[in-house]
Amino acid sequence: MTRAHLRGSLRMRLALFQPDIPQNLGAAIRLCACLGISLDVIEPCAFPLSDKSLKRAALDYGPQADVQRHDSWAAFLKSPARQEGRLVLFTTKGASPLHDFRFQPGDTLLMGRESAGVPDEVHEAADARLFIPIRPETRSLNVIAVAAIGLGEALRQTGGYDFQPA
């Protein structure tokens, strides 16, 4: 049982929509393992994703990570994890800056594809669409940098940093 399970069912989640880069998936697994956050991977990925490659991407964080795979966007929406909490999409086309949003326990933070973001149907399904302000002469942050910033703020707001030093 992971730390995410130990602290109750209404916990933050991170979801990656059809990731393009396997190294980013590995970084997301590590991020989620360290923060006690469940990770949803919405397939298809732009790279072959097997149980073996997932274990390789997780490195030694696999046993500490709660990773759920979903065959499609529709399967993700029907999953038990999606029946609670809001869907919070991080996008360069966001309506509100991260710092103006009030996170709640149970929110799922959704990250789009590195190459293309998410389609309109995903935008429409989101309860909130956020952006992280960056300098105007730059295009975007790495998807896992966005996930780390977003989860950090969400956990800060909801009191989710309840870890004791090792």
Kindly give the residue locations of the regions a language model identified:
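Post-transcriptional modification and biogenesis factors for structured RNAs
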Residues: 1-166
